[in-house]
Each structure stands twice: as C-alpha cells, then as structure tokens.
Amino acid sequence: MLISALHVTDFAGFRGVGSAAHLWLFSKPHVHQCVTSDFLNFASFPGVITQPPSCPASTMGKKSRVKTQKSGSGASAVVSPKEMMNLISELLQKCSSAAPSAGKEWEEYIQIRGLVEKIRKKQKGMSVVFEGTREDYFPELMSWAQENGASCDGFTIANFGSEGFGLQATRDIKAEELFLWIPRKMLMTVESAQNSVLGSLYSQDRILQAMGNVTLALHLLCERANSASFWLPYIRSLPQEYDTPLYYQQEEVQLLLGTQAVQDVLNQYKNTARQYAYFYKLVQTHPAASKLPLKDSFTFDDYRWSVSSVMTRQNQIPTEDGSRVTLALIPLWDMCNHTNGLITTGYNLEDDRCECVALQDYKENEQIYIFYGTRSNAEFVIHNGFFFQDNSHDRVKIKLGVSKSERLYAMKAEVLARAGIPASCVFALHCNEPPISAQLLAFLRVFCMTEEELKDYLLGDHAINKIFTLGNSEFPVSWENEIKLWTFLETRAALLLKTYKTTSEEDRSMLEKPDLSLHSRVAIQLRLAEKQILEKAWASGRAKRLNFQKKQEEGAPLPRYEESDIALLENTNADAKLPIILRKLEEVEDGQGIQMDEHTHLLNGEKVVYGMDMEANGEPVHNETQEKVSKDIQSPSDSIGSLNQKSQREVSDISDGRTEENPKENSE
C-alpha cells in the first residue's frame, strides 16, 4: 500500500511506503513563519556578515599574488587579490544593507547584479569545468552505484527530450514495487561534510552550523575540486548549469515584474550574492579554511552552481540513530522526473537506505516518475527550475487582515481566535474548484459579519458548536454574509488582475513566438498561471454571489447546524482536504509553520521508514538564529477596514505562482 503525503511544498520528494512501521512526514520552513522561502537565506550576524571572522592580515598571503587558473574551455583570467577583495567587500556591503523601500526592490536588484557581473567578468575561466558532457559520465555513475550497494536493475538513464534526462524502465515494473534503493554511504549529507575537509570551518562558523543547505553547497564544491573524492562519479553526472532564476538574464527576470513570485526571485538572488561574498572572504581569511580547495578558486559561478544543485536536489533524511533529520543529496534517485501522484519514497532505518516504490505500473522503455509534492508552480520555478503544466496543486497567495482601527476588530479577532485563525494571515487561492480553503472561507465569513452575527458566534446558543461550521460551505452565517464574502473575493481578484502589465491574452500570444528563450517562456507561463488562478477565483466569486442573491430573493430557508450534522463537517464541499476550521489546515497544505514532529505517523509493520520531501529551501533554522537569518523582504499583510475599503485598494499579495516545465531541471 502506498502512503499518500499530507502535503509537500518546497521539497521535491518523497514519503513512506506501506511496509513502514513509522512514517515521518516532514515539511519545510515557509514564508508564513520566521524562515523565508528563499534558498540559503541569512541576514547579518552582528559583527560577522559585514566582516567574516578573520586571522591576522599576515595569514592572507602576499598582497601582490595573482591568481590565474585555466578552465576546461582554456579561458583564463588574471586579477589581483586586492582588487577582487574590494569588489567582494562592496558586494557584501550592498547585500547586507537595510531592505529597500517599497518599489525599490528592482533597483536594488540591478545594482547587486551589476556588481556580480563585474566579479564574474574578472573570474572568467577560473571555474572548475569537467571535460565532455554529463551524459558521458552516466555509465560511471551506474557502476559506482552498483558497486556501493544501490539497486540498478530495472532501469537506466535516458534522454526524454523536452523533459531532459530521467530514469527509463528496462523491464515491466508493477505499482508499489520496490525498484530503487540507495544506501546511506552514497549520500552527501551535512554529517559527511562535518567529517570532510570542511569540518574544521564548520565547527567554527555559526552560519554553516545553522544552515545545513549552505553547508551542503560548500561540501559539494570542495568534493568537486577533489580528484580523489568518493562522490566524484555522482558530481560529474550533475548538470553543468541550471534553469533556476539564478541563471536568468536580467531581461528574463524582468518578465516576472508584477507577479506575486518576483519578490522571492529577487530575494533569492540577493541572498545568494550575500552568501557568496561572505564565504569568499571567510575562505580567504579564516585559519580553518586554509586547507580548503576553494582557497585558490572560488567563483560566483561555482557558488551559483552548487546552490542550484543543492536547491533542486536536497532532501531531509534521518540521522543514523533516527533522533533527528539532516539534509542529503541522493545520487541516482534524483534523476527521477516529477508527475502528479503520491509520495512513494521513504528512508528505511533498519537497512539504512532510501527506498522508492513505483508510483504506477511501468512498461519496458517507459519513463519512471516520482511525485515531488504539492508545490505551486512558483515553487517549482524558483527552487527546481521548471514549470509543471498540469499542476493540480497550483495556487497563489493572498494576504488579508482585519484592520485594528475597525470598530468591530476585537469581536472579529476573538471569533477568529476561537477558530484558530489569526486576524492577519496569508491565504491561498487554488487553481481547482473551490478556489478557497475552509480556513479562508471561515476568515471571510467572520470578516463580513455584522455586530449581531458576531455576538451570536461569541455569546449565542451553541456558540462553541457554531465555530465548527465556519469553514463548512453547507452552513452559511446568513445569505447576506455569503453575498458579502463572495462579492469581496470577486472584487479582490479583479483588482489583483489589474496590477499585471499584460493580459492573459497577451501572454498567450507571446508564448506562441518561436524565438522565445526557455527562461522567458517559463517566466511568461508563471505569470499567466497566476492570472488564470485569479480569473477562476473571480468567476467563482461571481457565480457564488449570484447564487446566494437568488436564494435571498427567493426567501430560501437558511440551513441550520445540528449535532447530527457532524458528518458533514468532516466531508464538506468547501474543501475535501480542509474540513474542520479549528485545524490550521491551510498551513498544512502550504507547508507554513508546521513542526516536523506534527507529521509523525504510526503505521502497522516491522521496519522503520522515514518519509521525506526533496527540499528546495533547506532545513529549519534554530530558534536562537531565526531572527538573524530572516533578512528577506516580506510585504505586510493588508489591513482591510470594511467592504467598501476593500474595493478601493488592492491586497498586498505574495503568491507562489508557477510556470511550465523546465526541460533541464524537471529531469535532473
């Protein structure tokens, strides 16, 4: 039996199989809480980020030293250490400065990108490049995997055209058949980084200790530079470049302006540039970094590559004793492409290996897919580098809040609190019908309540029981309340659609151009996907409004909640996944703020298996460092005073929209 995942957002990936005794489901940190959705984000540690810990100046080597290194292409670059360090310091200072004022984020991005391009130009030809193509190293990868205890029977690596490389069945494989396993010793993990040449620096640097994804990125770079590395067959098989927004040209990023995803894209670039500058200085000045192979060559392109490699591939696995989770790169398994379905991979602690069962029946020569999780297309584009056209989990986010200056604020906040909903919150509009979750339905109902209705839900008969009906579409507060909330949704969606610089029709026309670059196509697809969700929300709001207006005009009786109707609360049409409003199910679906231990499930069986998601963002940051590593720009939630005020200004939204599949990253 396959175990369906509760939710996955920014992780590609996998959860448990039916033979599991214990299935642990993990979620990523999300923008709704303290940790941002940007990969590898950290803010200025006082006295650290602007100037990494350093040894005396004498340990930096001769100031007249000149670096020259040839790449695989034969190009070379000559630049003095002092000149490079000045540029790096300028970049670090720019990226560590206070967040720009609203509307100035693009200007800041241009400035940061300009500095990065100066650095890249001076570093041209200094990056490590393997000869040949990645395809040349696939046979070596398969042999290495087999020699080290992985299963290699039943599939091979093949090119699937627009989807890129993936796993191809070499025999018939049945659904739920265990066809792939990877032992721990093959994985690149935070623990293996601690036991490597990076260990000394790790033990002394707080950022590495707090952010496993950063550690994994530097671990990958150090091993790539080591010709005797155990993981070299795996590293050589990785793409030489990616299609994450870190690789977009400026004009390609510009196509995302006005979308709800653009802020995450800009933050991702800024954070990556800041981290590169910080670690460049650290590698050059810290005594514990003196033996790192990065000391002689550590380019921005190198770091961008390692960040993208980790961001598109990392996953959480249990430590050897099973007491906690750690981050890992999983060779061979990460060749699987994504499709809709269920999580079918887990970690078997007894055999100490990752195990993957078939999502469905596969015939010989068919591509073998896995399900990366319930990610939005914005998450796929930003963290995986592809757009998934048939994404049944696509959504955009909308920030809503009850204005504290509103006369009824205290009453509304109290009703919402009893329902487990904050007075200001990030919600999601979904691509499917209905477009709103039970939590959002409950919020809008409370938001639109009159004073008498609020009193009824606070002090009236069966007030406690009524709270349970707030997220259930079967039990309206009143016809007037339903009309108000659906009018609000209709108006809000219409206003948000007006913020885009292009229409859906114009986007579709642009996508027909044959000379469109891959990244431009993905950006436009993501932009269009956001609009389509808003258009569906508008249409749904209008249809619902008209329906309830008709009921009101006809004098239809209002359905009343009875205790005998409890079954309806567990099978509501409002959202099959989100039935009871007291559960913060919107957070579960979007991966926002859910602690890992809340995803622990006990199943019948004998083995211990951890279910996992392939992460795109990294592991949670410890509480004591969260404030220090949350230097991203987050728009304040909209404070909405009344229905009239709502229609006069737009809601400040941050959504994860999506775009279409990226041939490279979908396959890699």
Indicate residue ranges for each PLM-predicted region.
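Flexible phosphate/Mg2+-sensing switch loops adjacent to catalytic phosphate-binding sites
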Residues: 188, 195-211, 553
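E2/UBC-UEV (E2-variant) core
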Residues: 204-208, 217-220, 400
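Long, positively charged leader/targeting segments at protein N-termini
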Residues: 2-3, 38-186, 191-194, 222-668
